[in-house]
Amino acid sequence: MTVQTSPPSAALAETMLDMGRRARAASRELGLLTAQDRTRGLKAIAAAIRAAAPDVLRANAEDMAAARAKGLAPAMLDRLALDEKRLEGVAAGVETVAALPDPLGRELARWTPPNGLDIARIAVPLGVIGIIYESRPNVTVDAGVLCLRSGNAAILRGGSESAKSSAALANAMRGALKSEELPVDAIQLVATTNREAVGHMLGGLEGALDVIVPRGGRSLVERVQAEARVPVIGHLEGLCHTYVHAAADPKKAVDIVLNAKMRRTGVCGSTETLLIDVAVAATLLPQIAKALTDAGCELRGDGRTRAILGDITPATEADWATEYLDAILSIAVVDGLPGALAHLARWSSGHTDAIITEDTAAAETFIANVDSAIVLHNASTQFADGGEFGFGAEIGIATGRIHARGPVGAEQLTTYKYAVRGTGQVRP
């Protein structure tokens, strides 16, 4: 598979429709496979990625050179970059997905109503999933293998910045499927960087797509949600918060905040706003600020924060709404737990928020009242990751309320049907 630039519109439309038809056919073939067949395919993919490492890393080096020439931000470059360690992590993640319990055929519930029917709710695939994402080549693999594990066919459309890396990875995955005599079109990558391809996917490819999963910045996700004619599992943005409560353990507070912000600043689980209780701000905030600035983090604060820390950049309303994906942190001093909850009610994206406290009652109040997909107590927001949840990988973090919420793994890429068994009943 090679990267194309801009085929004529009519040709692109037919190419996309053909991909949809082939994906639909592959999804039917997947329905005939056993769990062991899919596991065999996943293990073959892990081996193929390792074998293709020189080609993948060479392609990634070309993508990185082009991205630097275009002046991509450091956070975007970090997301795009692959090295031997990261690529081995990708392959190991595939093996973890292969070892997961099969999500299909699970009996979710079973009951017998007064009419005597035996009714079971059974997990089944969604069908054909379109995944639209930006400059993260690992998503090519994560999305492809999670769809395979859950019996879904995948049409992948990555960002132009990662086009060569994604093509090399897709070639490895498809080659593995072919070698195992499994449906190769279960994983397809849109080979063109022409943005019209996204529009075709949003139209549903004449009924071929059952759901679309966007993974990227706000503009991408908002476009998908506004224009898609098929259901969307949306991942809007991170904009995560960490609240240091009055009863926080000081060492935990310093360690967790430093990790939540600086472990990897370019991931969606990075804390972008620190809320600190007024009761401990004067004593604890300077310790946290020193750890952050020593690590190279720029701080921005409200008036009470600046009164404690001195000469730092004033935080504006725009800062409270900004996912920096960089070594920048906004800080607000809040009036206890009610003040933290009020700030989150206004500014949280619904992705991931955390409280640091030794007060169990306060933690439970926070968990119950913060309306986010992931709410943590005494842990870094950087645990907002499907791999850390034991899902092996994730296709994204869903911030909506319909179908899936939080890390979207193989289990979340299923729906259900009802198997109803009778003994000759007719309805009166």
UniProtKB/Swiss-Prot annotation:
Q: Does the keyword Cytoplasm apply?
A: yes
Question: Which top EC class applies here?
Answer: oxidoreductase
Pfam families associated with the record: Aldedh (PF00171)
Keywords of the record, alphabetical order, are:
Amino-acid biosynthesis, Cytoplasm, NADP, Oxidoreductase, Proline biosynthesis
State the coiled-coil residue ranges. Answer: none
**Catalysed transformations (reactions):** L-glutamate 5-semialdehyde + phosphate + NADP(+) = L-glutamyl 5-phosphate + NADPH + H(+)
GO biological process terms, alphabetically, are: L-proline biosynthetic process
Cited function: Catalyzes the NADPH-dependent reduction of L-glutamate 5-phosphate into L-glutamate 5-semialdehyde and phosphate. The product spontaneously undergoes cyclization to form 1-pyrroline-5-carboxylate.
Which HAMAP family is this protein grouped with? ProA (MF_00412)
Q: What is this protein called?
A: Gamma-glutamyl phosphate reductase
